[in-house]
């Protein structure tokens, strides 16, 4: 009798699993920036493809091709040209053209954290704010920032580059052919910036000490996802 029940349960699970594979994965809105921009997740159990839509500009683009899981911390994003999306567990995908194209962004190498690590544990993250084309990731111990939204013109093709002198008098030069990360593609703390040559770039100078205040934001302040969607 028990064997029959177990066989029946196994068969039922197999049938349900096969039926779900044949069924189109559910799509749900997991974040709204405002009245015309939003993120959709396509997949079962809140994991799958992530898509961005801007109805005003006619943009519909894929941000993550698979395995995306929502960022669960506070998320405020009024910025339009520069869009930065994080995920559960960390990491960034960013767009610098209103969401038409996407590329990866990273934590800068160096001692961003008090313990010498270059990135925070996910549980230490408090919030992620993207405003005025710049991202600010607040953690328990640090504020990670992307650069100001432009590249140092001295490092453009054909530019003079940047010559700088260290405290010991040694002189170095940053060549335009090896300029380092383009704007918006790495996140760094002031702690790490002290020992990084990026501090000589104009787009890394005079960075704020705290996340700028965001007023009159009409979007969501957290991502949302229904685990039972499609069932």
Model-based region annotation:
Residues 53, 93-96, 140, 144-152, ...:
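Conserved Ser/Thr-centered positions that define the repeating blades of beta-propeller domains
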């Amino acid at each position: 009798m028990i064997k029959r029940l177990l066989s029946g349960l196994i068969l039922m699970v197999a049938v349900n699993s096969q039926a779900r594979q044949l069924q189109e994965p559910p799509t749900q809105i997991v974040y709204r920036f405002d009245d015309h921009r939003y993120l959709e997740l396509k997949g079962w159990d809140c994991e799958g493809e992530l898509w961005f839509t801007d109805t005003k500009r006619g943009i519909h683009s894929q941000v993550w091709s698979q395995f995306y899981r929502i960022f669960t911390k506070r998320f405020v994003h009024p910025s339009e040209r520069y869009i930065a999306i994080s995920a559960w567990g960390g990491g960034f995908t960013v767009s610098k053209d209103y969401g038409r194209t996407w590329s990866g962004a990273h934590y800068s190498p160096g001692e961003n954290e008090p313990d010498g690590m270059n990135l925070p544990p996910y549980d230490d993250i408090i919030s992620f704010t993207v405003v005025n084309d710049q991202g600010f990731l607040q953690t328990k111990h640090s504020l990670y920032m992307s650069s100001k939204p432009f590249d140092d013109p001295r490092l453009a093709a054909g530019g003079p580059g940047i010559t700088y002198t260290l405290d010991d008098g040694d002189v170095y030069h940053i060549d335009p052919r090896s300029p380092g990360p383009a704007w918006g593609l790495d996140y760094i703390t002031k702690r790490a910036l002290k020992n990084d040559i990026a501090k000589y770039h104009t787009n890394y100078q005079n960075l704020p000490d705290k996340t700028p205040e965001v007023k009159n934001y009409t979007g969501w302040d957290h991502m949302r996802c229904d685990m039972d969607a499609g069932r």
